[in-house]
């Protein structure tokens, strides 16, 4: 994942704005978009050789590790505790509807068996197993979608184009060969889309690496067309921090809810595509042994509700340990989110953003004639909600069905909340009339 503030040039924008010109999503693709939006909650997994060093997924470039030295990590990668069934069971019980896994991150190591390079988890490690295959099959068995993160950057391959990251990894500049590298990526994407069953999405990352070279062409048109040809229902997601290009099916935001830009990576306009925000449980994407600053479960629940109230999904990240186990702190939070969703999932899954834009007190979601008021931060006994046009037939506390007093005028509805119950999200259900 990109850690530095993005400063993209207008020329880069123009060069990529028509990634797949005249793209017309297929009926299968449109149905997949709706399923994606209905799911609302996914799990992101950053796992690779970098976990062994315990310094996050950018350690290779942050520490300027020579690529020939870094590749030696493969000989020590033997995660005996990896259990795809245990992972997916934890995700399903947390209420997640899909999983996005790093098939190949910026360090260039493939976490699947690929004929395109021996530098992969099945051929280069004593572990000798195809992690992507096991995870995809288990997701399918348990009814979760599988999405594949795929980096456009490669700090290990000698032919990969040099960008503003990975410059200290020792690769000889004279061996750069963009044509060969793009051929490699297309061949790997073909493997991922033909050997692992239905794929919910390909999640690209790294366009921003060439923001100092505005004339650079990532040839996204070819990549997007390949994906939509091999699997028309597969969604294209690109974490470029720009407004969506033609050919993309989802707009994603990094470390921010749609419409916010607290991290400096999400200043782009919000589109009409399905939306997703990716966020970390602690402060890191890949496993970082010193990062114990996990967000409280209540904060994560509020973030999930905040995403849904903006019409978006939450893709919540976990960095598995070097031994293949999920951190205990992550499992604890997954269990807490799952408990909350079992009680309140009706107000999240399959909903749309509500009629009231996000406020200091919280957000709204809606389904049919129901509007759900998610009161995330409001200390007073009364709450004014500017809902106009339709009559409110009934207001009740979602948790226990207790009817709430309210009054309505042409400006909106004032709810008498009473004593606020414990928990991260006080939900009020409104039943609307005509």
Question: Residues of each region from the PLM?
Answer:
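Sec/Tat signal peptide C-region and signal peptidase I cleavage site
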Residues: 15-19
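Sec-dependent N-terminal signal peptides
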Residues: 4-13
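Positively charged n-region of N-terminal signal peptides that target proteins for export
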Residues: 1-4, 91
């Amino acid at each position: 994942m990109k850690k530095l503030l993005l400063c993209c040039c207008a020329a880069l924008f123009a060069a990529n704005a028509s990634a797949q010109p005249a793209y017309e999503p297929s009926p299968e693709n449109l149905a997949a978009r709706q399923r994606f939006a209905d799911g609302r909650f996914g799990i992101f997994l950053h796992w690779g050789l970098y976990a062994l060093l315990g310094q996050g997924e950018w350690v290779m470039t942050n520490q300027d590790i020579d690529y020939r030295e870094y590749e030696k990590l493969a000989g020590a990668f033997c995660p005996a505790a990896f259990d795809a069934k245990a992972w997916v069971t934890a995700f399903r019980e947390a209420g997640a509807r899909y999983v996005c896994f790093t098939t190949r991150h910026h360090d260039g190591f493939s976490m699947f068996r690929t004929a395109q390079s021996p530098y992969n988890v099945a051929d280069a490690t004593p572990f000798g197993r195809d992690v992507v295959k096991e995870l995809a099959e288990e997701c399918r068995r348990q009814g979760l979608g599988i999405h594949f993160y795929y980096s456009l950057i490669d700090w290990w391959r000698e032919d990969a184009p040099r960008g503003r990251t990975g410059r200290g990894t020792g690769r000889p500049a004279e061996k750069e060969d963009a044509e060969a590298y793009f051929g490699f990526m297309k061949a790997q994407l073909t493997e991922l889309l033909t050997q692992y069953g239905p794929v919910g999405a390909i999640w690209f990352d790294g366009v921003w690496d060439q923001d100092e070279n505005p004339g650079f062409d990532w040839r996204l048109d070819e990549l997007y067309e390949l994906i939509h040809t091999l699997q028309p229902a597969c969604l294209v997601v690109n974490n470029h921090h720009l407004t969506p290009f033609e050919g993309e099916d989802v707009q994603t935001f990094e470390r921010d809810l749609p419409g916010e830009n607290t991290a400096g990576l999400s200043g782009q306009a919000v589109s009409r595509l399905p939306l997703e925000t990716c966020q970390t449980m602690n402060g890191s994407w890949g496993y970082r042994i010193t990062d114990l600053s996990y967000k409280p479960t209540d904060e994560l629940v509020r973030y999930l509700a905040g995403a849904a109230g903006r019409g978006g999904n939450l893709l919540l990240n976990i960095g598995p340990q070097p031994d293949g186990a999920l951190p205990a702190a992550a499992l604890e939070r997954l269990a807490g989110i799952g408990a909350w969703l079992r009680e309140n999932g009706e107000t999240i899954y399959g909903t749309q953003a509500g009629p009231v834009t996000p406020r200091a007190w919280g957000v709204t979601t809606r389904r049919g004639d129901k509007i759900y008021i998610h009161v995330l931060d409001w200390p007073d006994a009364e709450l004014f909600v500017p809902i106009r046009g339709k009559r409110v037939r009934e207001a009740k506390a979602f948790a226990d069905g207790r009817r709430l007093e309210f009054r309505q005028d042409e400006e909106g509805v004032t709810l008498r909340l009473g004593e606020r119950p414990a928990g991260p999200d006080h939900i009020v259900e409104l039943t609307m009339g005509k």
